[in-house]
Each structure stands twice: as structure tokens, then as C-alpha cells.
Amino acid sequence: MARHEDLRGQVAIVTGASSGVGWQSALRLAEAGVKLCVTARRQSALEQLRVEVLQRGGECLVSDGDVTVAEDVERVVRECVAHYGRVDLLVNAAAVQSYGDFDQLPWEHITRVFDVNCFGYFRFARAVLPHFKKQGHGHLLNIQSMLAAGSAPLLSAYAASKHATLGWAQSLELELHGTGIQVSNVLVPSVSTPMFDHAPTMLGKKPVPVPPTYDVDLVARAVVRLAKRPGRTSVPAFLQGRLMLWLNGLAPSVGKAVLSRFGARMQTTDVPLDRPEGNLFTPVEQGVGPRGSVPPTPAWKRFSATLGLAALTGGVVGGAVLGTRGLLRAVR
């Protein structure tokens, strides 16, 4: 596994950079000395990001485009290489979602979620891979979701797109073994970004992320760590994230029982909202920058949730051990 502890001078394309994880990751990479090419549909937002990068002493090229349009993707990569002479890192961060029960979601919403979250990653990867192979090195860093290894009500299309993207990334990693090209993934928990202020909803009420919610900088710092030490999968909310993954593997029925009963309630408010399209097909003006209207969950609440998960996981593991011992005694 190649390491790049000093990122100064590397060139990165960051997609979905007009808000949220893409925006904050771009800033953190710029602080580490990475030269940026930022892209999204909203050029005015990208220009604001560029100003912040320049104020921090970084370099930033703005190249607006839509990840669902192959010509835009190819142009962004072409402009980046023409400007900097190469590209070393691709951060796939563009994402959308749509809230509603599966049979309520318009079919075009489902296909659009896949076109952005899944095929958008594919398009950019195919556009940069020839450059990576010619250079003999490169790094594909994909912003994934904890839902890539799980599920949630009201987010069936989003969760399915993330499952597909993680499977693709893991397969691509095997194909690229020994080429000098690395593949990394960040399994993102709920973070306070404008995504939840942009997303369409079929519910007639304002949606919110599944708690607990973390600050977006948690993910951006994980992106920088992976840029330095590529070829891994990072779970930024380490203890709680790992516990959730372990619990889902050890006793999936527990998570299923909780989410089927409370999952939809945890993601909705009593605030009426008529937003059937959101930013799926057309960019919206509001929600520029890294953070959204839903604040991060206070640390003490996250700690309490982690303790609860730890106790639940411990109980499941303990029950499994006792059950195994009983079975062994029975067959002796």
C-alpha cells in the first residue's frame, strides 16, 4: 500500500463540491497542499469555494458540470489535465437522495438517484483511469455511506445505489491490483450537510438525517487521511460505526426490528414541506457550503448512543458465546 504523507503538489478532482462533504473535503485537501479542480452543477457556488481555497493559500480550478452527462465529465478531466498537467486523485462526492416509500417514489427519481450516486462515480472513474494508467499511479476515493452496508426505510433508492457503488469499488480494487492505482472508500454516517435541505420528499414533511448526526468535517478529515494512506475503507465515526456494522453482521434482526418500527419516524418532522423535486434535476440556489440546517447531535448524546450500542452488541456476543457453549456441551 503506497503512502503519501506529504500531499503537497498532488492534483485532485473533487465532484459534488458546491456543498456538503465535497466542499469541506476540498478545503481540507487544499490545506494539505493539494491542487484542486472542483466540479458541480452550480458554478456560482464553486466560485465561492474557490475564494475560500485561495484565502487559505491553495490553488483551485473551477470546472462546472453534471456527473450524469458524459461530455461534462470528460471535459472536466480534460480541463484539469490541461491546467495542471496531470491528475493524481479523484474524490467522488456527488450525491442526491429522494425520501418516500418505494412505491411512492417516481420512477424517474429512482433512476436519477442511481445516475448520480452510482453511474456518476463510474463516469468519472472511466475518465481518469486512462490518465492514472499512463502515469502508473492514481487514487480513486469514493464517498460512500453507512447505508452501503445497511438499510433504512424511506431511502430505498439511495441505499441501493450505495450498495451498488461499494460493490463496484471493491471489484475495481481487485482489477487494479498491482497497477499502482489505489481505491479507497469512506463509509459516511449521518452528517450535517445541505443534502437534507435539497432532497425531494414524497412525505409532505421536512426530512432529517437518521440520528446521531456528525459534523461534516469528520468526513473531510477522513478523506485527507485516506489521501495520505490509500487503499482502505474508512469508517469516520469509528466506534459507533464499527459497532453498528458488527451488530448488523451478528444480529441483523435487531437492527431490522428497530428501524422497521422507528426508522421512518426518526427521519421526519412535523414541519410541513412541499418539495417534490428538490435538486434532483435542477440545481437549487440555497444550501451552499459545507453545513446544512440540521445541527450535529451533541457529543454527550452520541456518547450515550455509543454506550447503548456497545451494551447491545456485547449482549448479542455474550448470548452467542453462551449458545455455542451449550451446543458444544449437548453434542459431546
Functional labels for PLM-detected ranges:
Residues 11, 18-19:
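Conserved glycine-rich cofactor-binding loop
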Residues 34-49:
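Conserved glycine-rich Rossmann-like NAD(P)H-binding loop of the short-chain dehydrogenase/reductase
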Residues 64-75, 107:
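The beta1-alpha1 cofactor-binding region of Rossmann-like NAD(H)/NADP(H)-dependent oxidoreductases
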Residues 93-98:
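Conserved NAD(P)H cofactor-binding loop of Rossmann-fold oxidoreductase domains
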Residues 101-102, 109-111:
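Substrate-binding pocket helix/loop in short-chain dehydrogenase/reductase
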Residues 125, 161:
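Active-site helix of classical SDR
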Residues 178-270:
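SDR active-site lid
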